[in-house]
Amino acid sequence: KIDSSIRSILDQNQYLTEESVYNHLSKCYPIHPIAAILMVSVFQRLAQNQRSMFSFLSTNEPHSLKRFNKQYPSDLFMLDNLYDYLVFNLRNVIIESEISELWTSIDVTIASLTKKKKIPDKHLKDCQRILKVIGMIEVFGKEVGLQPDFDTIASSSFVDIKLGNKHTGK
């Protein structure tokens, strides 16, 4: 099933069909489909060559896909996991790139959640995950047709997002 976030990408690109997207994304397992879509943009903008993508996929670096699969063999690799990989392994590249200022503001916002202690501990990880997802989509999503809207954030984080007393059921 193609969710609304991926459907919006299909709607914007006349060369992609639902079948071709489904076939390609199903081969990316255990990478979440939206993380797989964003990876193209991430590694094109930050990597100097294919070595960074290769390192992410096949080395045992902290937060790499290989290490993630060893630690969590039945989980999906989500956007917040990709964020953690970038922070730990490509921080210097990010700092020297055109996204440095925006990335720093995302980092500071995430760090401030812990320092201010305004969010109960039981919700802190979910809030951090949502901010990482929003940040990743904000920085890299436009190039691939993703916006940090409610459906995309909910789909990309697997967090049960509630707005006040209302819950959309998505």
Locations of regions flagged by a protein language model:
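C-terminal helical "lid" subdomain and adjoining coupling/linker elements of P-loop NTPases
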Residues: S4-R129, M136-T152, S156-H167
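Short, basic alpha-helical nucleic acid-contact segments in DNA-binding proteins
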Residues: K170
